Amino acid sequence: MIAAGAKSLLGLSMASPKGIFDSNSMSNSRSVVVVRACVSMDGSQTLSHNKNGSIPEVKSINGHTGQKQGPLSTVGNSTNIKWHECSVEKVDRQRLLDQKGCVIWVTGLSGSGKSTLACALNQMLYQKGKLCYILDGDNVRHGLNRDLSFKAEDRAENIRRVGEVAKLFADAGIICIASLISPYRTDRDACRSLLPEGDFVEVFMDVPLSVCEARDPKGLYKLARAGKIKGFTGIDDPYEPPLNCEISLGREGGTSPIEMAEKVVGYLDNKGYLQA
């Protein structure tokens, strides 16, 4: 840490955090990260430069530094871009957190209990010392997806964006819980394809429309039946149930949110996601 009020160039030596780069099977320690830093006039930390104006080498794991690898490519409408590699990878972040990053994709009709399950699951994993984050379908429309409507093309883009963000969370080693109606199989399958095999866990809230409509926690079914909401899933727009989801849950039998969350946690534990 840089001492408060430091004005001159400082040499910082940051040893590898325990559990990231060290293992019980390795007796000799890995190399440390050495960064040359200084404090600017506004108090912010910046990298210092060599006399020739270049940024000094940042020694990293086993002597490797962040690199720009691979040819220039075109992805969608983005041209002349290159993927930037870094020596700290997903496996290192997972060791730091002692868990494996993945996406728990909770899908189902409005009122099926998706958000309730997501919160119960988040709390249960938190109590186990596991780092999670919820991407809730309504919440993301307050910011990231506030520019999207509920037209078919915008709903597809909504799911695509959430899938990409969820992938980043998983790559960071975090257990990401995405809770969205996501009515179309093609959109959900596209999100699944973004992640390595097994890292996308689809949880289907298999609750009948009649039960969801009877609950109607937001009053949306009533508005849809009155014709005030068009294209509402389950009323005048289809919901396509998963064909091969990892977990299927239903509350018609009186199963509590805690019991459902325990089932998901049990699945994650059995698959090895709750340890690095």
From Swiss-Prot:
Disruption phenotype: No visible phenotype under normal growth conditions. Apk1 and apk2 double mutant exhibits a semi-dwarf phenotype.
Binding site for substrate: D138, R141, R155, N158, I181, S182, G231
The organism's place on the tree of life at top rank: Eukaryota
Signal peptide: none
Region (Disordered): 46-74
Gene Ontology CC entries for this record: chloroplast; plastid
Stored SUPFAM superfamilies: P-loop containing nucleoside triphosphate hydrolases
Site entry: Participates in a stacking interaction with the adenine ring of adenylyl-sulfate: F150
Catalytic reactions of this protein: adenosine 5'-phosphosulfate + ATP = 3'-phosphoadenylyl sulfate + ADP + H(+)
Keyword set, alphabetical order: Amino-acid biosynthesis, ATP-binding, Chloroplast, Cysteine biosynthesis, Disulfide bond, Kinase, Nucleotide-binding, Plastid, Transferase, Transit peptide
Pfam name, any one: APS_kinase
Pathway: Sulfur metabolism; hydrogen sulfide biosynthesis; sulfite from sulfate: step 2/3
Binding residue positions for ATP: G108, L109, S110, G111, S112, G113, K114, S115, T116
EC class (word): transferase
EC number: 2.7.1.25
Transit peptide range per the UniProt entry: 1-38
Compartments in which it is found: Plastid, Chloroplast
A GO MF term: adenylylsulfate kinase activity
Effect of D136 to A/N: Decreases affinity for substrate and catalytic efficiency
Tissue expr: Expressed in root vasculature, root tips, leaf epidermal and guard cells, pollen grains and funiculus of developing seeds.
UniProt-annotated catalytic positions: S182
Result after altering C86A: Increased catalytic efficiency in oxidative conditions
Compositionally biased intervals (Polar residues): 62-74
Purpose of the protein: Catalyzes the synthesis of activated sulfate. Essential for plant reproduction and viability. Required for the production of glucosinolates.
Stated name of the protein: Adenylyl-sulfate kinase 1, chloroplastic
Organism: Arabidopsis thaliana (Mouse-ear cress)
Lineage of the organism: Eukaryota, Viridiplantae, Streptophyta, Embryophyta, Tracheophyta
